[in-house]
Amino acid sequence: MESVLLSARCTANTATVFWNKPENATADTVYEVSLDGGHSVHTNRTHYTFTELIPNTEYCVTVYSIGSIHICTLPARRRIYVTEEPYNAVGDGKTLNTAALQQAFTDCGPNDEVYFPAGIYLTGALDLHSCMSVCLEKDAVLQGSSDPTDYLPRIWSRFEGTEQECYRSLLNAGQLDHTAGANCENILLYGKGTISGGGHVLAERMIDIERENLREYLAQNAALVATCENDRTIPGRVRGRLINLSNCSRIRITGLTLQNGAAWNVHMIYCDDIVTDHCTLRSGGIWNGDGWDPDSSTNCTLFATEFETEDDSVAIKSGKNPEGNAINRPTKHICVFDCHSNGGHGICIGSEMSGGVADVQIWDCDIAASSNGIEIKGTPKRGGYVRNVTVRDCTFPRLLIHSVPYNDDGIPAPEQPYFEDFHFERLHLTGQKQEHGTVESVA
């Protein structure tokens, strides 16, 4: 792992420390944690959050048998209330607030935070920028509209492994550039509120518009369409996500409910150092409704998160043949731990993995309420590799490592993909897959 054994992320009043599970640890291992050498707390999880801290203050956190880390809470920030002058956003769930909210986001400096009090704030696409913070209070909902025109103009993005123009997502950060590093950094999205997309209605409207735009192309390429999952696959690739991070670094999303993107909920493309923790991700009834998707990204960490998704709760990707082979940006150093599913397909690597996937660590997850559990997949055309995957102390319905027939258009890579160096330890495989409220035995 490139990431250090012990890490921390802070707000003004909290510090969350998290660490890699030691090789000799088991599901019963208990860790002792202290702040500035004071009273110790004990936890059987590989993370702990200290609360009621003083802003802009240095502390030392010790996890005995792991190590110590010096941290500094964030300074208290000036709050930009979206409901006050000059923004006057209306949280009635009916008034479209896009212009007002975008102005608040634009005005947010490094020492500010955009603050949403309780209410339902209807909006179209919004753009984030470096060094900003957004706080959603309990019962505050940032609600994406179901009108595709509210997500124009389109932006350059990547969906199912191919770069193309897509509708903007509800929240957008960074500009896509597979030749470069980060162009947007240091963003904090936090609170106890909800970020909710336009969901199924928005998705279907986007697909219908694009199907009409591509009518002649689809008619002339019937053989290509026949290789797709269905006739909505190609037009469906223009959908935005709930949160789209392109070429971003040092982003944290914590405490929020994230739900109902038009496709995937959180999508990281060409990113580094992304932390998502203590969130709830939902996407019931949404086609391709993934939860958390690192895509040609590095050092991404997900923990203490609940899932109820229509598709993969987690999907680790790195592009699709032939473009993914040419761009050749692997996804690596991914940690997923202490996560729980209440529906969905489970934790997946692939099938878009043409740029390669390496060093994935998964531990202490209960994904029993899913259809697939842990799944590593590709197609013979993909090329690339998946290697160095470690999964420990988890519950799944089953473990799948296989080739799949869908999303298989595109020119084949010169070689088939390589799957190698997988380590599985102390897994509880229930043999009972769960999908849409039904339970079925698996072989």
Ranges and model annotations:
Residues 1-443:
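Extracellular/periplasmic carbohydrate-active domains that bind, remodel
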